[in-house]
């Protein structure tokens, strides 16, 4: 157990992987023009000088390029992954060897995961971060919930709702025993958080509505150059990559059930259809359901689709969308996976506890569950992100969009004073992120004349669309 006065340099799987990681980071930099342009733009200016940034985001090669961008802009950075399976160990090793404290390895336990999250919130001299780069909201949650517990220590005695909560509360007990005001001190120095993903944004808005949010937040997820690119085009490529690396299955001719038709669901459905699958979509939202139908997908309920599907993909950000009863009804050899942020989209804990199923591990992140009737299913990445648990996540180019937004959000929070609330980056920055990625694709923009700009009522150099425009 570490104490608040013992600040560790790093904890990774194997530091000898650093050279391999560095080679891949060098390759990724060429595919991440937005981040590299941001480095050039602010060279010598250090807009993040003095900032202590805690990062809770998948420790991949692409994230390594983000980390080193933040460091070049002047920040002191500590990093952990936001998922127990998503770390690329050679990326973590390279970052650790560069001198950035990183606490991440592929295959963490829940106890280790929350220990790692705690480490990124503990800087030298007993200080906490003043900025967070978050993905899913766990680092933010640790501060907010820790603050709440310090106001009402009886919360430490409540029975945990699940294994995740049990592991988290163990960290809270250790911190509280050392310093009963630790999280109040951390919160007091916080300038803000930039949140990467849909699930984390939902958490932020819920905290705001309840009056629990303690510092400003920028919703990076809903920047157009994030949600319409990372969520859509990234998933379109990385979902199939994860499924195929895990199972070697032929997708063509299969029935794939995609649960949810938001941006992630849209990308996932397109991916599976492109491989020749017949895709069934489930939806709660009539607008998204109509979109799916107009794209030619069958739209049904899970209770009906469960009997037809060969592959099931959850994309909703909600819990219990695939239940234990659903899994018991699936066809023999069905594949079950998730590309939403948390594993509770699938009732994984209920499956673990079910005496009528036997588990056989096929290989890392691929488990076969056989039920009493002889049918089996394959659960990928224990219900966590299949594209990162079973493959390497989204390609570098699309992550450059997202991470350029993250970098700009960190600069925005550090250099300006925001009131507590949830904000989005301005439209002109969204357009700038897109512009930084055009040259690499050989794109040539048409330019308005003065008369044309005046005619449609937009500035000559943008922004070209109103805030309410839906791309």
From Swiss-Prot:
Its cofactor is NAD(+). GO terms for biological process: L-homocysteine biosynthetic process; one-carbon metabolic process; S-adenosylmethionine cycle. It is found in: Cytoplasm. NAD(+) binds at residues 197-199, 231, 260-265, 283, 318, 339-341, 387. One of its GO terms (molecular function) is adenosylhomocysteinase activity. It catalyses: S-adenosyl-L-homocysteine + H2O = L-homocysteine + adenosine. Keywords: Cytoplasm, Hydrolase, NAD, One-carbon metabolism. Its EC number is 3.13.2.1. Substrate binds at residues 60, 135, 196, 226, 230. InterPro entries: Adenosylhomocyst_ase-like_sf, Adenosylhomocysteinase-like, Ado_hCys_hydrolase_NAD-bd, NAD(P)-bd_dom_sf, S-Ado-L-homoCys_hydrolase_CS. Pathway: Amino-acid biosynthesis; L-homocysteine biosynthesis; L-homocysteine from S-adenosyl-L-homocysteine: step 1/1. SUPFAM superfamilies: Formate/glycerate dehydrogenase catalytic domain-like, NAD(P)-binding Rossmann-fold domains. It comes from the Bacteria. Belongs to the adenosylhomocysteinase family. PANTHER family: ADENOSYLHOMOCYSTEINASE. This is Adenosylhomocysteinase. It comes from Pelodictyon phaeoclathratiforme (strain DSM 5477 / BU-1). The lineage of its organism: Bacteria, Pseudomonadati, Chlorobiota, Chlorobiia, Chlorobiales. The gene is ahcY.
